[in-house]
Amino acid sequence: PCSTHGRTPPCTEAILRAGIARVVAATTDPNPKHAGRGLRLLRKAGLEVRLGVCRVEANTLIAPFACHMLHHRPFFTLKLGLSVDGRIADHTHSSRWITGPAARKEVQALRRAADAIMVGAGTVRHDNPSLWPRPDGQRNPWRIIIAGKGPLPLDAQVFNDEHAKRTIVAAPRGWQPSCAQIIRGKGAAVLELPAKSLLASLARELGNLGIMHVLCEGGGILAGDLLQAGLVDELCIFFSPVLIGGPVGAMGLAQWKLNVAPRFSLRESRRVGHDLFIRMTPATAER
């Protein structure tokens, strides 16, 4: 429970006034202002305090908030839909649909849980997605496009629908001036960032906007870039029981030597329709 004054009085004061004798907490608050202080105050006041019940589940639940609080950036979930041989599309670059309807329904749930949905320029060019999963009345996501060197299609849905003001293009400095001007004129934002640290710089900008959770749904290039930048906090993969072959791999051109390759710990695995869902976090992450 919080122990400082903010928009509301401290929870610890309310607990003490209510005469509660025993408090059970799953985990400590990642906010450095609290971080166990409230529990210490309650113990000092004579209350019985039990900490750690359902700790793993609680830390998973608050992971985006904790990442934003401790690292001042969003929590990045990378979602991939893959064939069993690790392909995100066939040799014609068609990816509709690798996974089945049950998996696609779960993806919608992932989208609804995120503050922002991120894709690369290739996804905008090939698929022209709306990236707008929420029914009316629910909080609306930011839509983030990672631009490469070339222009983006100005007729894309993300620039022309009623939600264009919720679109952010992250581009290297000096990117396509005429294209950037037109996109800004449509109401979207264009953030020009250092090319060599574009994703890291973007993460800081998004943190400053209060964005806590980004779902990344781009293709292999974006997936590889995020991994190389150390910006994959959670990896969600839907495997379809189909073999495709060909060159369109899950990580684009990114590659690592085995001894330094990104490693993950399995957190969840289950069947979703005819597909297999697995959720992983970096092997060094504590949950």
Label the model's feature ranges.
Residues P1-E57, W142, E162-H163, W175, ...:
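Zn2+-dependent cytidine deaminase-like catalytic core
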Residues N31, A35, L51-C54, M69-R73, ...:
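Short capping loops/turns at secondary-structure boundaries
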Residues H5, G19, C67-M69, R73, ...:
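Short secondary-structure boundary segments
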Residues R7, A35-R40, F75-R287:
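Enzymes that bind and transform nitrogen-containing heteroaromatic metabolites
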Residues K44-E48, C67, G120:
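Alpha-helix capping at helix-to-loop junctions
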Residues L39, V53-G81:
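Proteins enriched for Cys/Gly/acidic motifs involved in redox and nucleic-acid/cofactor modification
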